[in-house]
């Protein structure tokens, strides 16, 4: 009963193979999946998929690499799509200083606006941050986190940074990057954070975990992330799966449904 809290079954790489991917995931114990739409094509495809499969949920937002195209019309579009009954969060939103497809000031403005929308809609928000941890932290700190909290997606910082985000009301989600040999800082965070503050994800088709590193990632491979973190923490994979799934269901508001 593993919950992949962040996957992109809605991208072109998986077109025509979604049934196969979902079946493989189920076979490997990944029984719930959150499909993240980050621009109009991926949002539309995500909504089509969640209407077809009971075990799929959807997160909708405007990715920081798309911040330059954020307009009032886009915001109206998002607000309309966020009404879908299987929407569990707003995202992925944040800052991306690696690609820098929009100026920092524009990314910050769009990030702040979407945090506010998430609070207005009583939804948790999912954060993408790349080469921008400090600014991401300061924006979340100044905007505040709503009662539903937020998720640091595919976390790649230190334990110290993870604890700072947790103190703001965020939960830390670990992807296949935690399995990489040189990811010792991320591994320390996955080992030491309180159990109720961690989630697991794939970010498929990106960032495949060991032993599949370098290949196309699959939502089924959440199993390898669970196995790795469970070993780090000295617990069984089943125990970690139960806890992280319960965490996801609580944050996404599925525990009361």
Language-model regions, residue ranges each:
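Mid-domain alpha/beta scaffold segments of enzyme catalytic cores
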Residues: 1-257
């Amino acid at each position: 009963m593993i919950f992949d809290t962040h996957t992109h079954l809605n991208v072109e790489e998986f077109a025509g193979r979604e049934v196969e991917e979902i079946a493989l995931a189920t076979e490997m114990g990944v029984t719930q999946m959150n499909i993240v739409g980050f621009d109009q094509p991926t949002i539309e495809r995500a909504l089509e998929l969640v209407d077809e499969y009971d075990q799929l949920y959807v997160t909708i937002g405007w990715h920081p690499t798309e911040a330059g195209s954020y307009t009032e019309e886009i915001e109206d579009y998002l607000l309309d799509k966020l009404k879908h009954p299987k929407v569990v969060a707003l995202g992925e939103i944040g800052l991306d200083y690696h690609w820098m497809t929009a100026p920092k000031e524009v990314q910050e403005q769009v990030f702040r606006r979407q945090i506010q929308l998430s609070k207005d809609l009583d939804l948790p928000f999912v954060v993408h941050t790349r080469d921008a941890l400090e600014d991401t932290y300061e924006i979340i700190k100044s905007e505040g986190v709503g009662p539903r909290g937020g998720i640091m997606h595919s976390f790649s910082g230190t334990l110290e940074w993870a604890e700072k985000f947790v103190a703001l009301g965020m939960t830390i989600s670990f992807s296949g990057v935690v399995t990489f040999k040189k990811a010792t800082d991320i591994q320390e965070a996955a080992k030491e954070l309180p159990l109720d503050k961690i989630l697991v994800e794939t970010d498929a088709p990106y960032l495949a975990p060991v032993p599949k590193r370098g290949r196309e990632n699959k939502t089924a491979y959440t199993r390898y992330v669970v196995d790795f973190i469970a070993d780090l923490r000295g617990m069984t994979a089943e125990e970690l799966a139960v806890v992280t799934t319960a965490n996801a269901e609580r944050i996404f508001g599925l525990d009361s449904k």
